Amino acid sequence: MIYGIGTDICDLRRIAATFERQGERFAHRVLSDAEFAVWKARSERWPKRGLSYLATRFSAKEAFSKAIGLGMRMPMSWRLCEIANLRSGKPVIVLHGELKEWFEARGLTAHVTVTDETEYAASFVVVEKL
């Protein structure tokens, strides 16, 4: 049964402007440690791809927060929600700490898709109750 659906579109120019003001502090606030390592490697090699990576993660976490009906309030937090990729490239949501406990206690599972273009990143999340 569908528990919730969330979607988000993110303007890469907005992410770039925030990054210009806050620098790596912004990436640390939004990304898990594993995501930060991927972002750092991509940014050093291809700055535009690093920005797109940051924007897709921001967008996916916003969409997830909407799908679970919490928005950005506890137990939902940026760093407890990680968007990883399977070897095939498929994005998956990996939860940590309090958020993982909250999610599992409700018997939920999530599906995520992300996309990015020149100026936008978008995400769609479907959460099911098993």
UniProtKB/Swiss-Prot annotation:
<dbReference type="InterPro" id="IPR037143">
    <property type="entry name" value="4-PPantetheinyl_Trfase_dom_sf"/>
</dbReference>
<keyword id="KW-0275">Fatty acid biosynthesis</keyword>
<protein>
    <recommendedName>
        <fullName>Holo-[acyl-carrier-protein] synthase</fullName>
        <ecNumber>2.7.8.7</ecNumber>
    </recommendedName>
</protein>
<feature type="binding site">
    <location>
        <position position="62"/>
    </location>
    <ligand>
        <name>Mg(2+)</name>
    </ligand>
</feature>
<dbReference type="Pfam" id="PF01648">
    <property type="entry name" value="ACPS"/>
</dbReference>
<keyword id="KW-0276">Fatty acid metabolism</keyword>
<comment type="similarity">
    <text>Belongs to the P-Pant transferase superfamily. AcpS family.</text>
</comment>
<keyword id="KW-0963">Cytoplasm</keyword>
<dbReference type="GO" id="GO:0008897">
    <property type="term" value="F:holo-[acyl-carrier-protein] synthase activity"/>
</dbReference>
<feature type="binding site">
    <location>
        <position position="8"/>
    </location>
    <ligand>
        <name>Mg(2+)</name>
    </ligand>
</feature>
<comment type="function">
    <text>Transfers the 4'-phosphopantetheine moiety from coenzyme A to a Ser of acyl-carrier-protein.</text>
</comment>
<dbReference type="InterPro" id="IPR002582">
    <property type="entry name" value="ACPS"/>
</dbReference>
<keyword id="KW-0444">Lipid biosynthesis</keyword>
<keyword id="KW-0479">Metal-binding</keyword>
<keyword id="KW-0443">Lipid metabolism</keyword>
<dbReference type="InterPro" id="IPR004568">
    <property type="entry name" value="Ppantetheine-prot_Trfase_dom"/>
</dbReference>
<keyword id="KW-0808">Transferase</keyword>
<dbReference type="InterPro" id="IPR008278">
    <property type="entry name" value="4-PPantetheinyl_Trfase_dom"/>
</dbReference>
<dbReference type="GO" id="GO:0005737">
    <property type="term" value="C:cytoplasm"/>
</dbReference>
<dbReference type="GO" id="GO:0006633">
    <property type="term" value="P:fatty acid biosynthetic process"/>
</dbReference>
<dbReference type="GO" id="GO:0000287">
    <property type="term" value="F:magnesium ion binding"/>
</dbReference>
<keyword id="KW-0460">Magnesium</keyword>
